Regions:
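Long, contiguous binding/interaction regions
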Residues: 1-61, 69-94
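Short acidic/polar micro-motifs at solvent-exposed secondary-structure junctions
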Residues: 66
């Protein structure tokens, strides 16, 4: 005779594996916009590995390229959050 016991605890899946993604963001407003962009990255991504910003005098759009660790499920939300910022012209995977 065998006796099997099953746990009644609900199944919880393991956290999603984080992946490294490179994101290119183009924005207007110059250097004053960088803190808001970085805040958005850190709120939706887990860790910023690389960050490069190119702001030039007399040029309308500036660019920021970042490499972040993010779960695959949160990637679209991160890109959408960047695009919702009023200073952002575009945000795409690089």
């Amino acid at each position: 005779m065998s006796l099997s016991t099953f746990s009644s605890a609900p199944y919880t899946s393991a956290p999603a594996m984080l992946v490294r993604r490179r994101i290119a963001t183009y924005f207007v407003g110059g250097i004053d916009q960088i803190p808001g962009l970085v805040t958005t990255l850190t709120q939706h991504g887990k860790l910023i590995h690389e960050l490069s910003v190119d702001v030039r005098e007399g040029v309308r759009e500036s660019s920021m390229v970042s490499t972040v660790l993010v779960s695959p499920d949160a990637l679209d939300a991160l890109l959408d959050a960047l695009r919702e910022l009023s200073s952002v012209v575009s945000a795409e995977l690089a």
